[in-house]
Design a protein with these regions (language model features):
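Alpha-helix N-cap/start motif
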Residues: 41, 246-247
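Short, charged/polar, Gly/Pro-enriched secondary-structure boundary elements
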Residues: 76-83
Length: 247
């Protein structure tokens, strides 16, 4: 085992929330990128494997000892090329692709499930239209690192297309991130920042809501609820100037 690191920032909350929940994948984060045009899918698949290897946080493993949770980077873990699915022969390739993604997210993807905590798939739905599906456990990535990994993989793919060398990893080793977090947590700046945000919280108004009824007591889920509304042209013309004034 390499250096053991404590959970930091949002990680302890994510770990505890998953332990308290019986949902199989509520703490997985996923999206897909639509790619239009000619694509060298085997080359992109190789770029995915190399780009994921450059981010050591994606090789993180977790263990709990005497009630304390530790994380460590598995030096032996290597990422293979993601699977490529061709759905052009399906009656509705778009919905078939979405079904593939939903099937992946319906698995038990908890941190202790033994399933891969990072997964990519390239899905072809037309001759020049692809979906690049990406899914991670939230312990591994946050809202910044998720798209940063995507951008690095895309940079590797573009470099290889022009026979340029593989771009170096832009990612800070996670051990350095933990060290910086711990230094900040022990600094006077952390005390000042905490006092500032505590005051901001005390001054916040009640949460805004479009409903007079309280929130229902249902448990959270990984399901997605969508509601689409069409605004009349006249109402939209009235709203547009107001939106521009507050942009």
């Amino acid at each position: 085992m390499t250096q053991r690191l404590p959970l930091v920032a949002a990680q302890p909350g994510i770990w505890m929330a998953e332990k308290l929940s019986d949902l199989p994948s509520a703490w997985s984060v996923a999206h897909y990128v639509e790619l239009n045009g000619e694509l060298d899918a085997p080359l992109l698949a190789k770029a995915v494997a190399v780009g994921m290897q450059q981010a050591d946080t994606l090789r993180m493993r977790f263990t709990e000892e005497n009630g304390e949770v530790w994380q460590w980077i598995d030096p032996e873990h290597t990422f293979g090329e993601p699977p490529i699915a061709d759905l052009r022969d399906q009656p509705d390739p778009h919905h078939a692709a979405l079904a593939l993604m939903q099937a992946d997210l319906r698995q038990n993807l908890r941190a202790d499930s033994g399933k891969p905590l990072a997964f990519h798939q390239l899905i072809r739905i037309d001759d020049t239209r692809w979906y690049w599906y990406q899914r991670y456990h939230h312990l591994l990535v946050d809202g910044f690192s998720f798209p940063a990994i995507t951008r690095q993989i895309a940079a590797i793919y573009r470099a290889w297309q022009s026979d340029a060398p593989t771009p170096e990893s832009p990612f800070t080793p996670f051990a350095d991130v933990v060290e910086e977090y711990q230094r900040y947590h022990q600094s006077e700046a952390w005390q000042r920042d905490g006092a500032f945000w505590a005051q901001q919280r005390r001054e916040l108004p009640p949460p805004a809501s479009m409903s007079a009824a309280p929130l229902p007591g249902r448990s959270a889920s990984a399901g997605i609820l969508r509601m689409k509304l069409s605004a009349p042209a006249g109402a939209f013309r009235q709203l547009a100037p107001a939106g521009g004034a507050h942009a």
